[in-house]
Amino acid sequence: MDGNGRWAEGRGLPRVEGHRRGVESVRRTVKAALELGVTHLTLFSFSSENWGRPKQEIHDLFALMRRFVRRDLADLHKNGVKIRIIGTRVGLDDDILRLIDDATLLTKNNSALHLTIAFNYGARDEIARAASRIAEAVAKGSLGPEDITPERFGSYHDTADLPIPTC
C-alpha cells in the first residue's frame, strides 16, 4: 500500500484520497485472493517509519484503519479470513490496540485466507525485536550463542510461522 499518497498527489488529489483508494484496493485484493484460493496474503499497511509524516496524515491513516476494521471485519470473518497483525504495538492508541485484538480474536479459527497486516511495522524494528528475544534466551541459558543460525534467527521473526513465499 506504499505510494498511495504520491499517487493521489500525481493526480492533483489530496493525499488522503490516495489512502482511501488504497483501502479499496485492499478490499479488491482480499476478494480476489479468496476467489483464487490464495491461502496466505501479507499487506504492508503502516510502516514504523510513517511516524515522520505530518500529524494530519497520520490521523487520517489511523481513521481509515479504524473505519476499515469496523466496516469490514464481519465480512472478513464470514468469508473465513484469519487476521493477524505484525509490527510493534508501541505508540498505538488504546482503541487501535483493542481493534487489533478484537479482529485477531474473532478470526483466530478461520482458515480460508491467512491475512497478515504489517501495521506499525519496520524490518529494522523486527530484526531488533528478534535479536532482543534471542539475547534474552541466551541470557536465560536456554540458547547458546553457537545455536544462533540463520534458521534459528528466522524463528524469532514476526512471520516465523508463515510459509516462505515460493514465487
Predicted regions mapped to residue ranges:
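Flexible, compositionally biased loop and terminal segments
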Residues: 1-167
